[in-house]
Amino acid sequence: MSPAFHPLRTRVGEAIEQSLFRRTDPVPPPRPSGAVTLRADGIAVTRGGRPVLDDVSVDVRIGEVLVLVGPNGAGKSTLLAALSGDQDVHTGTVHLDDRDLGEWTALEMAQRRAVLPQQNTVGFSFTARQVITMGRSPWARTPRSDDDAVAIAEAMRICDVVAFADRPFTALSGGERARVALARVLAQRTETILLDEPTAALDLGHQETVMRLARSRAEQGTAVVVVLHDLALAAAYADRIVVLEQGRVAANGPPADVLSEELLTRVYGHPVEVIEHPVTGATLVLPRRDQR
């Protein structure tokens, strides 16, 4: 056998190459349910001299779906952006895994939290599959890159995008783009995911699918934060709800404690009725309307 092709030498060479060019697993092992992954403490954000967030404190825990609700302009998306590190805070602190956000690099944050923004734009003509594959880029040259193919295939399947995976992202409908963007976030497989109005462009069936996915991920050990306008979805799927009013936390707790007629009527500036479904017992939040 030629020395150049000796199997032992080949294996030794591969091991050396991996030790030199492949990073070790950059994140700690999974943590128990209830562990805090993100914490905002007394944060404030000001734009144009106007407070957008004012003394907001909230924590994000493994195993929970935390839903942010409130009227337009209440600060929901700004709070999500502050938690993700995409929005600087003027006072207060935000910690990710017990370290200030400013102490993490962009890559380290991408390995710990995945973000779905409101606007899903792609500047080049990538296919849907390529956009989803981008979710795996934080794990390049780490042991977790071995999971790339499985993570991408699973995300495509559960977000129902397989049928148009090879079409250009720019040629997709708004709802299809939203599902592709969500698949990218899920393919990233981080311990925390933050979703800004993930159901906004979706039909009724896909709205339920998205929230079931959020619920399932939480049960599997993920911390999930979702911005929603639909209070019925929030009531059905949230473990905790934070109600924002003019940049401040008006309420923070389980849906049954937070979704009161008095609070919601005040926050939304419109009479609200909170009732129990006669069959399922689910909480329903309805605007009161004049009889026709």
Swiss-Prot record:
Signal peptide: none
Compartment(s) of residence: Cell membrane
4Fe-4S keyword on record: no
Pfam families: ABC_tran
SUPFAM superfamilies cross-referenced by the UniProt entry: P-loop containing nucleoside triphosphate hydrolases
Keywords noted in UniProt: ATP-binding, Cell membrane, Membrane, Nucleotide-binding, Translocase, Transport
Membrane topology: Peripheral membrane protein
Record-annotated ABC transporter domain positions: 38-271
EC number: 7.6.2.-
Amino-acid positions noted as binding ATP in the UniProt annotation, renumbered to this chain: G70, P71, N72, G73, A74, G75, K76, S77
Keyword set includes Transport: yes
An example Gene Ontology CC term for this record: plasma membrane
GO-annotated molecular function: ATP binding; ATP hydrolysis activity
Similarity comment text for this entry: Belongs to the ABC transporter superfamily. Heme (hemin) importer (TC 3.A.1.14.5) family.
Function statement: Part of the ABC transporter complex HmuTUV involved in hemin import. Responsible for energy coupling to the transport system.
Subunit structure: The complex is composed of two ATP-binding proteins (HmuV), two transmembrane proteins (HmuU) and a solute-binding protein (HmuT).
Protein name: Hemin import ATP-binding protein HmuV
